[in-house]
Curated annotation (Swiss-Prot):
Quaternary data: Component of the retromer complex which consists of VPS29 (MAG1), VPS26 (VPS26A or VPS26B), VPS35 (VPS35A or VPS35B or VPS35C), VPS5/17 (SNX1 or SNX2A or SNX2B). Component of a retromer subcomplex consisting of VPS29 (MAG1), VPS26 (VPS26A or VPS26B), VPS35 (VPS35A or VPS35B or VPS35C).
Annotated function: Plays a role in vesicular protein sorting. Component of the membrane-associated retromer complex which is essential in endosome-to-Golgi retrograde transport. The VPS29-VPS26-VPS35 subcomplex may be involved in recycling of specific cargos from endosome to the plasma membrane.
Stated name of the protein: Vacuolar protein sorting-associated protein 26B
Membrane topology: Peripheral membrane protein
UniProt-annotated location(s): Cytoplasm; Endosome membrane; Prevacuolar compartment membrane; Golgi apparatus, trans-Golgi network membrane
Predominant place of localization: cytoplasm
Pfam families hit by this protein: Vps26
Keywords, ordered alphabetically: Cytoplasm, Endosome, Golgi apparatus, Membrane, Protein transport, Transport
Any one cellular-component term (Gene Ontology): Golgi apparatus
GO biological process: intracellular protein transport
Length: 303
């Protein structure tokens, strides 16, 4: 029985290393099992190069029908778990059919790779980039090894970045004017603004500003929308008086935000909203939601 079990054990160990692995930045990424691992960070147009090492276990040889390494960009919907939609697929053949008796190393390179989308792990969808090594075998089954990488892409400062101004209210009860300094914010930005009370005829308990993320997956009748409240910031406690102005100052850096994603490969979108919530003394809630655009600014760029 032990002999039979041993027959199905992998015959070799496969490792993947990057050429610039010692100097390349590593970022934390949450795995499917909930644990966090450090993963190398890349950007679109980077060259991805390194070595694949295949080492047979002692006393074993690896008969194979070829060795290849693939760079895959994939989208996985969690309602269709296990099925990946490839939007990037590059292949390098590393070896022709044969046998491996001892440690063998294969260099590989994918030059200036276009990686248009950022890595994203959401509620119902994930977008990932992965290196996949395949040692193709027949009856024994192919041997696979994966190495994930994180992709983040920077955007320039927007040429036009209008402020957001709106008047909202309940007829003859409440009339407010709110203003945010911009409509587009980078991930380390500060939201500045003010809430101005033009008319107050109801007793207010408090007022909060929320950051909400709305993830849409699928299309048409099969669209599924998931909304998360990522931050809640109290602006006011108690009832304001007519003419009162409440300042808004909300730092984005402490929160787990991503850039806005619009219709990624016709599979999903991620949008962000500022949600103004007013609660009166009878616990009735009044909302006003406004979409904002988030983008990733290079860390040495200034706003």
């Amino acid at each position: 029985m032990n002999y039979l079990l041993g027959a199905f054990k992998p015959a070799c160990n496969i490792s993947i290393t990057f050429s610039d692995g010692k100097n390349r930045k590593q970022v934390p990424m949450k795995k499917e099992n909930g644990q966090t691992a450090l993963v190398p960070l890349f950007h679109s147009q980077d060259t991805i190069s390194g070595k694949v090492c295949i080492e047979p276990y002692q006393g074993k040889k690896v008969e194979h029908n070829g060795v290849k390494v693939e760079l895959l960009g994939q989208i996985e919907m969690y309602f269709d778990r296990g099925n990946f939609y490839d939007f990037t697929s590059l292949v390098r053949e590393l070896d022709v059919p044969g046998e491996i008796y001892e440690r063998k190393t294969y260099p590989f390179e994918f030059p200036t790779v276009e990686m248009p989308y950022e890595t994203y792990n959401g509620v119902n969808v994930r977008l990932r980039y992965v290196l996949k090594v395949t040692v193709t075998r027949g009856y024994a089954g192919s041997i696979l090894e994966y190495q994930e990488l994180v992709v983040r892409n920077y955007a320039p400062l927007p040429d036009i970045n209008n402020s957001i101004k709106m008047e909202v209210g309940i007829e003859d009860c409440l009339h407010i004017e709110f203003e945010y300094n911009k409509s587009k914010y980078h991930l380390k930005d500060v939201i500045l603004g003010k809430i101005y009370f033009l008319l107050v005829r109801i007793k207010m308990k408090n007022m909060d500003l929320e950051i909400r993320r709305r993830e849409s997956t699928g299309a048409g009748a099969n669209t599924h929308v998931e909304t998360e409240t990522l931050a809640k910031f109290e602006l006011m406690d108690g009832t304001p008086v007519r003419g009162e102005s409440i300042p808004v100052r909300l730092f984005l850096a402490p929160y787990d935000l991503t850039p806005t994603h619009r219709n990624i490969n016709n599979k999903f979108s991620v949008k962000y909203y500022l949600n103004l919530v007013l609660v009166d003394e009878e616990d009735r809630r009044y909302f006003k939601q406004q979409e904002i655009t988030l983008y990733r600014l290079k860390e040495d760029a200034s706003s």
